[in-house]
Amino acid sequence: MIKKKSNSFLSCDRKTSVNVVIWCPDETEYDEPVAVLQICHGMIEYIDRYDGFARYMAERGFVVVGNDHLGHGKSVCTDDDLGFFKDKNPGEALAKDAHHLTVLIKKMYPGIPYYLAGHSMGSFVTRRYICDYGYELDGVIVMGTGHQPAPMVFAGKVLADVVRLIKGDRYRSRLISKIMFGAYNKRIKNVRTVNDWLTRDEAVVDEYNAGKLTTFLFTVNGYRGLMNMILYVRKPRNIERIPKNLPMLMISGLDDPVGEYGKGVYRAYNSYHGHIDDIDLRLYEDCRHELCNELNKEEIYEEIYGLSLIHI
């Protein structure tokens, strides 16, 4: 039987208790775990949304672990902190916390392969992590990422900085949200809801639309942190800091607007291709943004599991 446990640690902001969830394989089937898989979730969601994927991997011998990022899920002091990262240097906070979790889990499970997977905003957390702490890992999985043109990202950062000066760091801007997400449904026929771009699975979309922890507006601080991460991970000098021998799997849906329907994912792939020795790109027909919640999610799980085994 899979054991699911909760834990916590103090964030790098020195005040927030970061919520951690651990899925452990059945001890009667596995004397020791095959590997550890750490997950970085996306924007405006929480780690428990990966329960199905985590259980799939745990059933195959993996310890799966993840935390709610600052400003997400249970990693808040009050609801006012939802969508807020950290007063200073918000762009580095999520990767710092993710690395702290790695250190803690490695003490619990020493000497076995350690993988990091990140989805959407979590893919940018993961891409920042491997610039700063790539030496900790035996492999990395980048899901639902993008490579937006630098002028566009910089313009978004400037807008967030201006709004911050006028309204403050905790202001929740519908304008920025509309600019970020407003066009994501444009290729979908017969749109049902504002979040149809997430997945073809209508039940998942409806559950997402009904949740308090998946429908809040991001703060200006959160957007600033996200823009800073996106700009950070694309700089050649930061990419050069990634260990060349770190295997990377990059996966995305061809109907994912975050990855510009494959174009942005190819640009991200090409930015690493000349530096990382072992990098693999997989794009899935008809799939939207949340691959782990898609109609063919079992295929995605199987792909990740199979490619992980190659490097164990």
Where are these regions (language model features)?
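Conserved small/polar residues in nucleotide/adenosyl-binding loops
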Residues: I310-I312
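Short beta-strand/loop motif that positions the catalytic acidic residue
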Residues: M250-S252
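Alpha/beta-hydrolase-fold enzymes
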Residues: T126-L213
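Active-site glycine-rich loops that stabilize anionic/oxyanionic intermediates
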Residues: V34, H41-E45, L254
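Conserved alpha/beta-hydrolase
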Residues: A54-D80
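Alpha/beta-hydrolase active-site loop
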Residues: K86-K106
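N-terminal cap/lid segment of alpha/beta-hydrolase-fold proteins
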Residues: M1-E27
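Post-His helix in hydrolase/transferase enzymes
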Residues: K263-G264, C292-Y305
